Amino acid sequence: MSLARPLLSGVVTCFNEERQIRACLESLAWCDEIVVLDSHSTDRSAEIARSFPNVRFLERTYYGAAAAKNFALDQTRHEWAFILDADERCTPELRAEIEALLAAGPACGAYTVKRRCYFLGRAIRFSGWRNDRVVRLIRRGAARHANARVHPRVVVQGQAPTLRSPLDHYMIEDFHEYLKRMVKYGHWGAAQAWRDGQRASSFADVLFRPAWRFFRTYGLQLGVLDGGVGIAFCLCQAFATYAKWSLLWSWQLDAARGRSPQLPEFDEREETWRGAVPAAE
């Protein structure tokens, strides 16, 4: 018999994740409710999510990872929430640790979780991801995601200790799909940098920053020990850096000619990207 614990909400944000969402939600089936926030997917993500009896399915335009996660957290009904991305899975050992922690009475308002990362079906042990950790177990009001369109930082009131058990992160199983994702992240990263006032000092940034990213992840962070998949993974990270800085440089050239860059849509009322001035009420 499991120990009595406070009620727990699972939280998942997604867009066109029909290949991932079912396994993600199955790993959260033990939660008392699951809030799924979908950014108007055009595949079967909504159909799959709605097939789970404890899922509350919501739709909202995507203004960034921080805005999505904060909004989804605000829709939960219980004191504690456990957040997953669609490409993540809660492992049985992590579930057991979370349930025991909640039953015993948590001493902190948020907890960090280690991630075991997989790329093209292979475990990534190094390549800059060896110590990958994310804040995912949150008491209501104890943490918020600082605004960033990609990979937002979590601002926690107090400490966020790391749990022993990891979650599994299946970053990508299709190489072409991953490259498209890196282009998208590069676009968003460039847009965020532009709003923050960041600019390329010269075209050298377009050349040397990706080269440094590869050297750092493959050499200094021991991506070489991940074998052939490590080379591919580190090259993809370098490509994302190239996409960001090449686009930022092209926008600077356009600005010099009097043309404004076409940035992704931004939620002016509810959220601000890192470095931006909050909109007035």
Where are the regions a protein language model picked out?
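N-proximal low-complexity "stem/linker" segments adjacent to membrane-targeting elements
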Residues: 1-27
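Conserved donor nucleotide-binding strand/loop of the catalytic core
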Residues: 46-77
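Acidic helix N-cap motif at the loop->helix transition within catalytic regions
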Residues: 19-22, 43-51, 93-94
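Residues at the starts of beta-strands that form the adenosine-phosphate
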Residues: 7, 32-33
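A conserved acidic beta->alpha catalytic loop
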Residues: 27, 38-48, 62, 85
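Catalytic-site signature of metal-activated, phosphate-bearing donor transferases
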Residues: 66-73, 79-80, 91-255
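Alpha-helical transmembrane segments and their immediate juxtamembrane flanks
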Residues: 257-281
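Short acidic donor-binding/metal-coordinating loop in glycosyltransferase active sites
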Residues: 39, 60, 78, 85-88, ...
